[in-house]
Amino acid sequence: AVVLSESWCGDCTENVPVLAKLASLYPFLSVRIFPRDENLDIMDRYLTLGKRTIPVFVFFDEAGEEIGRFIERPPGAHAFMESARKKVEGLSAEEQKKAMYQARSDLRKLYRQGFYHETISMIRKILEKRYEPENS
């Protein structure tokens, strides 16, 4: 897997260790981590709605063909943050900043309460594609 990440990103600090643990369990899974900000040529191949969202995990089969991607966070975490963003609409800039800081703190707790299981499930579904028979 090719990974684009940065140490300052909360989603990276939550999800990259999950991938690293899976790589330790699956000998066929090799992981190469690239700092996003130093590899914009790679990053720009995997934009999300035109943005450089991280982490990006890109998985390949033995032939080097892409079989799937995991980008940013699992659906439960994404829904949580979208809800938090909607709740701060109309607040002052300072109130928004404070509320979003709290939301990110709450998200870290939610990862430990189970959101990381969604990350595992998503990655495993991608990896299972390695073993799917060719469609005729």
PLM feature segments, named:
Residues 3-5, 19, 27-42, 60-62:
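Thiol-based oxidoreductase modules, predominantly thioredoxin-like and allied folds used
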Residues 24-28, 44-51, 62-136:
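Non-globular targeting/processing and membrane-anchoring segments
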Residues 1-21:
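Local sequence-structure signature of Cys/Sec-based thiol-disulfide redox active-site neighborhoods
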